Amino acid sequence: MANNNNVFISYAWGGESERIVNELDADLQSKGILVIRDKRDLGFKGMIRDFMRQFGHGHAVIVVISDKYLKSPNCMFELVEIARNKDLYDRVFPIVLGDADIYDPVNRIKYIGSVLI
């Protein structure tokens, strides 16, 4: 599934994240860029963990960071798989939404706690 021309998008389903991802997906695909999203490309009864592990191997990864994303164990698993691969800073393009309260250190700790619980 992963090759040098794929762009993976990691996001929490629903709300503003989904709207933004739908727009990005349509725009990138109209330019001939293959976009991979779990909601569409995983398939019925697909192996979600195997699919998530592929995220880190894409040519580029767009991460739409929202409050919901930061509180989701599945999204955090995707982020860990992305981070396990080299050239992270050259291949990952974050989009931070307004509800993701990550700029205050105390609030970042709250996100860590919500995923670990």
Predicted regions mapped to residue ranges:
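Acidic, Ser/Thr-rich peripheral helices and adjacent loops at domain boundaries
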Residues: S114-I117
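Active-site phosphate/pyrophosphate- and oxyanion-stabilizing loops and adjacent acidic/basic residues
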Residues: V80
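Conserved N-terminal substructure of TIR/SEFIR domains
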Residues: M1-V63, N74, A83-R91, L97
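Short glycine-/small-residue-rich Rossmann-like dinucleotide-binding loops
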Residues: S66
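Short alpha-helix boundary/capping motifs
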Residues: G56, K110-Y111
